Amino acid sequence: MIIDGLNLFFRAYMMDPSLGPNGQPTGGIKGAFKMLQKLVRENNPDKIFFCWDGPKSSIRRRAINSNYKEGRKPVRLNRNFGDLTEEDEKKNRYWQYARVVEYLNEMPIAQIYIDFVEADDAISVLCRELPNVKKTIISNDKDFIQLLDANTFLYRPCKEETYDVEKVINEFNIHPTNFALARAFVGDASDNLPGAKGVGLKTMAKRFPELKEEKTILLTEIIDSCKNEAKPLAFHNSILESEKLIKDNYDMMQLYAPSLSIGVREKIRDIIDNYPASFNKTNLRKMMLEDGTGNFSWTELFANLNMISITSKVKNEQ
């Protein structure tokens, strides 16, 4: 099971109203582990990877488009907590995030957090390094659809639905292999990446039915098709007018071959090969007492993590 860490944490942070002993919000912590318990119950994984955005992780994509992720509003609580100021909330949010990382450090769970590397790219490398292993990506982000194959699935908690190759084709008439290409024409408002005017996924699928095939379609093939159109529509002209924009979008959106150094790939390979097997329940219980998260029933999660710990230790000794 491969988890998009911030995606899960922010959902927990906004939804769970829990408070700690000092009256400060702790929903990001408590909610994250409630979600983790549910995910472990439903997926029964033998390994869990949490992937986080590393420091300065947006630099590479912002070098292509300086507006990448610009204008995003900070994640805020959807409820009031007395005299908690915006600055107090920001500090609390960061503390909760760091605390989740500390909890995970005591569990048989691998975390990937590398300078200049976004979680999306780390997840892509994980999938490429484990081609023959059944794995489920946990994220609401549709960017991961492009990584789906016979052994790779995407679970979107917001809709409580799992995508496989067949579901993607049935819903979008686009094969996962060509999903990033199609989205490059459409853009991604969540990352502040505009697309060609008047172009949507449904239109792309209708005008270019070859996108439904497993065969990789090239950006140049779509552009050339528009250039050679005998009776071009506004749709075709819009694409041709936005050619550079679309190319830049694709360079940022595609996860098939993330632009990562050999050193970064080796770090991720090392994390896979040296999966953490330790499970420090004593430290976890101390943290739970400090944060007031002990009233959440950890029994089921602990039992599942204990099994992962035992299995990992056996494999590490082989």
Where are these predicted regions, by residue range?
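Noncatalytic, basic helical substrate-engagement surface that gates or grips nucleic-acid strands
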Residues: 1-138, 144-161, 254, 259-274
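Non-catalytic nucleic-acid-binding/docking modules located in mid-to-C-terminal regions
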Residues: 41-52, 67-75, 80-81, 107-110, ...
